[in-house]
Amino acid sequence: MVKSSLQRILNSHCFAREKEGDKRSATLHASRTMPLLSQHSRGGCSSESSRVALNCCSNLGPGPRWCSDVPHPPLKIPGGRGNSQRDHSLSASILYSDERLNVTEEPTSNDKTRVLSIQSTLTEAKQVTWRAVWSGGGLYIELPAGPLPEGSKDSFAALLEFAEEQLQADHVFICFPKNREDRAALLRTFSFLGFEIVRPGHPLVPKRPDACFMVYTLEREDPGEED
């Protein structure tokens, strides 16, 4: 069901722009520009960091409580260096792995919320990593700022298949700021893929008037039904 929709990604407007992005590194880490999800591992994100870039998650209302305003040390960029910074990879455990995806889970203080790093292998020299939160049957993905990383079209397709087949997710949410210059293009692209705009006040997303949420509902066939 998802697979047929995912074929549309190959010719979608936004993903066609991906080659305009930064090609200086063979490994592309979407998490570098996604503070909303990358600040979660201790169950909180600082007020200061939540105002940087997306600013999607602070003082949450109903929905997955994947971050709060409790200050803590900043996130260390995966594979990077720095003093007094945290590196999630040191404590992450492998949740799922095949020839296309390597999914690791980071420990959190909330047993109902899981922080995932989903790495998609496109070629031997190229990988794309998405940061996500898995909570209450929904997978929440924060889109990186700027043009989507090169290879995103194939990587995102594999991610949605993983959500449906391995996580048995009910919904996949994406989040990005309303003031993005490419907002209209993102809305067209993901609407074409079957995503719908989430109306304000929806119980499954935080109250963020400055953020846009879209949802893909994964419908399953009743095993008792026959054609």
Curated annotation (Swiss-Prot):
GO BP annotations, alphabetical order: negative regulation of polyamine transmembrane transport; polyamine biosynthetic process; polyamine metabolic process; positive regulation of intracellular protein transport; positive regulation of protein catabolic process; viral translational frameshifting
MF terms in GO: ornithine decarboxylase inhibitor activity
Listed InterPro entries: Acyl_CoA_acyltransferase, ODC_AZ, ODC_AZ_sf
Family recorded in the similarity comment: Belongs to the ODC antizyme family.
Cysteine pairs bridged by disulfides in the record: none
Descriptive protein name: Ornithine decarboxylase antizyme 1
Role summary: Ornithine decarboxylase (ODC) antizyme protein that negatively regulates ODC activity and intracellular polyamine biosynthesis and uptake in response to increased intracellular polyamine levels. Binds to ODC monomers, inhibiting the assembly of the functional ODC homodimer, and targets the monomers for ubiquitin-independent proteolytic destruction by the 26S proteasome. Triggers ODC degradation by inducing the exposure of a cryptic proteasome-interacting surface of ODC. Stabilizes AZIN2 by interfering with its ubiquitination.
SUPFAM superfamilies: Acyl-CoA N-acyltransferases (Nat)
Keyword presence, ATP-binding: no
Entries under Gene3D superfamilies matching the protein: 3.40.630.60
UniProt xrefs under PROSITE patterns: ODC_AZ (PS01337)
Pfam families in the record: ODC_AZ
Subunit description: Interacts with ODC1 and thereby sterically blocks ODC homodimerization. Forms a ternary complex with PSMB4 and OAZ1 before PSMB4 is incorporated into the 20S proteasome. Interacts with AZIN2; this interaction disrupts the interaction between the antizyme and ODC1. Interacts with FAM171A1.
Keywords: Polyamine biosynthesis, Transport
Protein origin, superkingdom: Eukaryota
